[in-house]
Amino acid sequence: MDEADPGEAEAAQAEAAQDGAAQDGAARDALLLLSWLSPGYPVGAYAYSHGLEWAAEAGDVRDEASLGAWLADVLSHGAARNDAILAAHAHGAGLAGDPRAAEALNDLALALAPSRELHLETSQQGRSFLDATVAAWPAPGLEALATRLPGPVAYPVAVGLAAGAHRIARRSLVTGYLSAFLQNQVSAALRLAPVGQSAGTRVVAALSPLVAALAAEAEGAPLDALGAATLRLDLGSFRHETQYSRIFRS
């Protein structure tokens, strides 16, 4: 029997060690993102519907099919896509520890909010997220970046900065962010009662491939790619401010 080549054995061991390290890194990324984007994370995501409450009141969202169509448009043409691009760029600022880039991105993200309620939705969640994450998951550079953003912080910017500072993979960040957005919207729809739990689960499953495709696109998209075309949602967010009966803040 031929003796094993020591060089080949060492190479195999090194490759196995690299694979193990990569798996450990992916598991760590998943654990952080699952914690940060969980409904239990103290950002108050449950209080916002991103215009969905008005859409249900107006009859735009009334069943499984209309909910799926509404959310597909919000993901593809609305704030969700913009947020994914902003989160990806904030990831770069967090990775580099670049406070100027963080400030510029935050100013841009807040300026993109089309109404008072949607501005509150992103700024309150972002501020809460950054404060909670700095306290519970400190990372080199993250606290310094947070001190440069003492006021309102856009939610995608806060999540992106934290993910970059913790060296989470960018694609994982963007995919997790979009998935959490979708899940929160469906959760709001369940409370508004146009769909039940089984229908909501089917909507999430049907839109998951779109989430993956948008994450791949947003990961490397330039800021020039920002833009939205969800006028019905934007106008509805204005009307929601004076809606007679409501349970959400947006």
From Swiss-Prot:
Q: Which organism is it from?
A: Methylobacterium sp. (strain 4-46)
Q: Outline what the protein does.
A: Required for maturation of urease via the functional incorporation of the urease nickel metallocenter.
Supply the name of the protein. Urease accessory protein UreF
Keyword Chaperone tagged = yes
| Cellular-component GO terms for this entry | cytoplasm
- Domain of life of the native organism: Bacteria
Looking up HAMAP family in the UniProt record yields: UreF
Gene3D superfamilies referenced in this protein's UniProt entry, alphabetically: Urease accessory protein UreF
Q: Which GO terms describe its molecular function?
A: nickel cation binding
Q: Could you give the subunit structure recorded for this chain?
A: UreD, UreF and UreG form a complex that acts as a GTP-hydrolysis-dependent molecular chaperone, activating the urease apoprotein by helping to assemble the nickel containing metallocenter of UreC. The UreE protein probably delivers the nickel.
Location of this chain's protein in the cell: Cytoplasm
Cited InterPro entries: UreF (IPR002639), UreF_sf (IPR038277)
Matching PANTHER family, A to Z?
A: UREASE ACCESSORY PROTEIN F
According to the UniProt record, where is the region Disordered? Answer: 1-21
Q: Which UniProt keywords apply?
A: Chaperone, Cytoplasm, Nickel insertion
| Ranges of Low complexity composition bias in the record | 9-21
Q: Which family does it belong to?
A: Belongs to the UreF family.
